[in-house]
Amino acid sequence: MGAHVWGPAFLRDELLPNFQLRGWSGDWYAGFPAMHFYMFLPYLAIVAVDLLLPYGVAFKLVAVAGVALMPAAAWFLARLSRWPFPLPALSAVAGFLFVFDFNFTIYGGNIASTLAGEFAFSIGLACTLVYLGLVYRAIEVNELRTLASVALAVVALCHLVTLIFAIAGTVLMVLAAGIHRIPKLLGVSKAWLLFSSFAVAEIVLWRLLDQPFATLMVALFFVLGLLCLEFRGAFRALTVGLLGGALSAFWVVPFYLRRDYLNDMGWEKLTELRENLFFPAELSGAGSRISITWLLALAGFGAVAGLFRWERSIIFLVALSSCLAIAFAQWPQDRIWNARLLPFWYLSLYLLAGWGFWYLFQAACSQLRAGRSAAPGTHKGRLVIYAAPIVALGIALAGTSLYLGTSPGGSYDADNDFRWGPLSVSAEDRNFVSGWAEWNFSGYENRAASETFNDLIQTMKKVGKDHGCGRALWEYDKDELGSYGTPMAPMLLPYWTEGCIGSMEGLYFESSQTVPFHFLMQSELSSSPSRPMRDLPYSSLNIPQGISHMKMSGVRYYLAYSDEAVSESKVFSEDLKVIAQSGPWTVFLVQDSSIVQGLAYEPLVSEGSFLGKRSWIDPAVNWFNDQSRWLIPIADDGPDGWSRVSVEEVDDLSSPLRFGNQSSRKLEPLKITEVSISNEVISFRVDEVGIPVVVKTSYFPNWSVSGADGPFRITPNWMVVIPSENKVELRYGRTSVENFGLIVTILGTLILVALKRHEKRRKVVVCSSKDTKV
């Protein structure tokens, strides 16, 4: 989580003073659209708390808010959904157990994922539970529609994956209401015949006949029938969804319409279905995991008993968990990782387990009443019922503290196993989140190598002052960087140097299509690179090619750590000049590296269509790795006078596309002066017009130019302009996409205010009517 402190600070210092919630930052990836593809609302909350508390404290409080409020959010869902007492309290216990679950660490929702940086997901999930409670009331009794719409907008502005869960939950809530109604309309026997026929038809079509389209059509027909049966509730849910979408449109619409410029990291689909869904303890890999047999048993009992009683809330939870399991198994290899669905699956199991515990407790109470020790309605009977959440909480606290190794009176043996009376937990199975939290929140200053990291920061501040501000590419070494607190520590160079020294690597890997080219460079310039992006043609340490790529990318400083990288870099003293030494780090100045540069050859325009995902990245990667192609860049668009080049398929899994070969016109040398670069404005002067100039800043459609034609995207992911005047200025700003989203939000806000006033008037009329009857 160490580098996440950059985001709220950038929002506070750069965006909000300019009345913006999104903008451009040159701090990472040679520039990227800040807050355009990453939800800003949790960051805005940090900025708000920072008005009263120190920044570090504000960050920590908001970061843990999602998991801290999860039990209350689960209680809120159950309470508003009118689950019988003591289910709201038991749901809070279920939420407590969910956040302490440590079978997954980066998927989102629990404490472990929050500590890995997924705190926006946790906040979004807690808000989703609140929203589902509100939308239940809106569907059922037409109350709280405006609040439900606002809650849905909040979910959207926290995390889009939780928004998908919220929408799916809303649809299933309406369908559950329809399913619950069928036995009353058709009778129990006919209802079961209908459900059985549907299930058999789906299984036969899907499994035996392998007809996915027919399977989908039958399911769609069944769903439409249920929606018609519950038309009033469906209409209310639709109005909530439309209004919530309108309120968040100022951010969601630009995200959606600019999605083609997202970077696809290629997270590999999880295919171990049985292990991930039911037996996580059998998964291989690092990290502690525990069996969830008890959870499956309780959830299964709750599901069976609830369906036998035809409990509407159980129908909803069973439908939700079933759809999540099927979606996890059938989700394609796509930008949205199927692992992101697992937290919702686990949460639905915990909520079902709360029902299962209650049914078991009811059975125990029935036995007591049969023995006349606690008759219904008596003081003893009420005490037994009220004891259910207390007993559940006691068991949850005892189990959680046992696995955390914090049980009162417990001790560690010689093997570092924790023992508490007759119970014990091995060191391998212990819950690690307490140690991780202490590591995360104790600060960089409390790390063993804090002096080394601080010296590096001070060195780079001085380098910026003496040699000028610019981008830095640092060698990756997990162990060395991890000793500073996190391998992401140098990402904060722009944070500590007030934007003077940018870092080529940052967070938000999906936010810029420059990311793959950075990791290709990192692999060339590191002895132990990270290589987090899949399906790229990485090379091992290759300093000469790395130097060329740094110059191609406008990198000003190279920070080398390993003996191999340092010694090889010193061989190329004409290109890399040693300017500073900081502990184990050698700082090189990359000679003749500029961000604005005239081109030697006229660009070629690709004839390919770039419709998102890797349609641009794959051929651009092939160009990036082929030194013979570097002199002639490829653009995605350009004037009619530029020659065209095709996109060809090649037999290479990592880069299956490449640009064709084509000659180009040599250009006259160009003199560029008065270069000025800030976050959202780049300006320069040229001595000749009509000669293309490359600006080595990540391309994004929100850039516009005055005094030139363009900008067009050019390989690998920069901008090219054709000056029509001697003075050229590029500016990042709003476009029609952002304006459209903002207009929709303004209209949605006006509708929200009108609906709220209408609800108030209706309440007044109802109250007056009741008074008249009295």
Question: Model-derived features: where do they sit?
Answer:
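Extracytoplasmic/secreted cell-surface and envelope-processing proteins
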Residues: 165-166, 255, 481-485, 566-571, ...
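Solvent-exposed loop/turn segments at secondary-structure junctions
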Residues: 100, 161, 478-482, 558, ...
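Active-site-proximal, structured, solvent-exposed surfaces of multi-pass membrane proteins
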Residues: 643-768
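A mature extracytoplasmic/lumenal domain signature
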Residues: 162, 476-478, 562-564, 592, ...
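Short, hydrophobic beta-strand segments that form beta-sheet elements in well-ordered domains
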Residues: 473, 556-561, 693, 713
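Short acidic, glycine/proline-enriched helix-loop-strand junctions
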Residues: 565-593
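Membrane-embedded transmembrane-helix bundle of lipid-linked glycan/lipid transferases
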Residues: 1-439, 443, 455, 459-469, ...
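Extracytoplasmic/lumenal acceptor-recognition loop(s) of multi-pass membrane glycoenzymes
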Residues: 152, 323-324, 396-447, 461-551, ...
